[in-house]
Regions:
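N-terminal core-binding DNA-recognition domain of tyrosine site-specific recombinases/integrases
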Residues: 4-6, 13-83, 90, 104-108, ...
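Major-groove DNA-contacting interfaces characterized by cationic-aromatic clusters
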Residues: 46, 129-153, 186-193, 210-240
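Basic, Lys/Arg- and aromatic-enriched nucleic-acid-binding interface segment
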Residues: 72, 91, 97-172, 176, ...
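C-terminal flanking helix
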Residues: 79-82, 86, 295-299
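C-terminal catalytic core of tyrosine-transesterase DNA break-rejoin enzymes
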Residues: 87, 160-163, 167, 174, ...
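Catalytic-site neighborhood detector that most strongly recognizes the C-terminal catalytic loop/helix
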Residues: 109, 194-198, 280, 284-305
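Short, basic (Lys/Arg/His-rich) helix/loop patches that form interaction surfaces
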Residues: 144-152, 203, 217-225, 235-278
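Conserved tyrosine-mediated DNA breakage-rejoining catalytic core shared by Y-recombinases
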Residues: 168-173, 177-213
Length: 307
């Protein structure tokens, strides 16, 4: 072991510089560790014990009024710092306390019927606008109908984006910011390098996704985004569809529902939860565990006893 032992605040700065500086999670990490240090004290890292961490979690819960989910997240930040110190040869990693129990989160997702209903709605809108455009051009070929053409293309692109979100399970902005160079047709995968947890992941393409990727990558340069819609434009169409399809009173019916749909289907079809975690790009398995109850045959063996 090394002799000069860093304090927890010094170790936090080391991790920030090495792993967090410039990342999307940097601010949350620093705030979380500030609360941890206040609860634990700015001790040398080799003086931190499991009972101390348990007490820290109690303090975060009682004095900071943090939910169990937030307490678990802050414990995760502490774990990262201590693991870094272990790699640097300062300490032997302590056994961390078990995460605090969190409420079971109700998972909403699109059924196949709901998916078809949504995509058919977008397809019908696209088709109606296209037919109207053709009719107007037939009436007067010399008139500029770029506005109609843009509206038609917008619904066509929205259809492609929603279908890809359902199959890929990525976050909306990960897809909207996707550049052509990150679509690997040779290996049939998309390389997401701008994920929320700053960890790159390669996600295989379904046949449907591959078709859309091919269509929208044609005539694009390597650094061009595949899609032209921004989040606001996409959400405007989604909210109109939500209202027209009769889901206006369903708060869960947001674009993020596509991600839940992909995750739910993977679990329902027997994909191991750790693979689902990697597919979604979750940093913590706890985030993926909200889908675990959807696994097939979880209770099927019990019914055999009743039979």
């Amino acid at each position: 072991m090394k002799t000069k032992m860093p304090t927890l605040s010094e170790a936090t700065r080391v991790v920030y510089k090495r792993r967090k500086n410039g990342t999307k999670s940097a601010t949350n990490f620093l705030i979380g560790m500030k609360h941890n240090i206040k609860a634990l004290g700015d001790l040398p890292v080799n003086k931190i014990t499991r009972p101390m961490v348990n007490k820290m979690m109690d303090t975060l819960k009682q004095e900071h009024k943090n939910s169990n989910a937030v307490v678990n997240q802050k414990m995760g930040y502490l774990r990262v710092v201590l693991q870094e110190m272990e790699e640097d040869g300062y300490i032997e990693m302590i056994k961390m306390p078990k995460p605090r129990p969190t409420k079971n989160t109700k998972v909403h997702y699109l059924t196949k019927q709901m998916e078809d209903k949504l995509l058919n709605y977008l397809l019908d809108k696209e088709d109606t606008l296209h037919q109207e455009l053709v009719r107007l051009i037939d009436q007067n070929p010399n008139t500029n109908y770029s506005l109609w053409n843009n509206r038609w293309e917008t619904y066509a692109e929205c259809y492609a984006i929603i279908a890809c979100l359902i199959d890929l399970g990525c976050r909306v902005n990960e897809l909207l910011n996707l550049e052509k160079r990150f679509v690997d047709f040779d290996n049939n995968q998309i390389n997401f390098n701008d994920r929320k947890n700053d960890q790159a992941v390669a996600v295989p393409m379904t046949k449907r996704v591959r078709g859309f990727m091919y269509n929208y990558s044609c005539y694009k340069d390597d650094f061009d985004k595949l899609f032209t819609l921004n989040y606001s434009q996409l959400n405007t169409i989604w909210q109109k569809a939500r209202k027209d399809l009769g889901y206006a009173d369903k708060k869960f019916y947001t674009i993020h529902l596509c991600r839940h749909t992909c995750a739910s289907r993977l679990v329902q079809r027997g994909v191991p939860i750790l693979l689902v975690k990697d597919w979604l790009g979750h940093e913590d398995i706890e985030n993926t565990m909200i889908y675990a109850h959807l696994a097939p045959k979880a209770l099927h063996s019990v019914v055999e006893v009743l039979n």
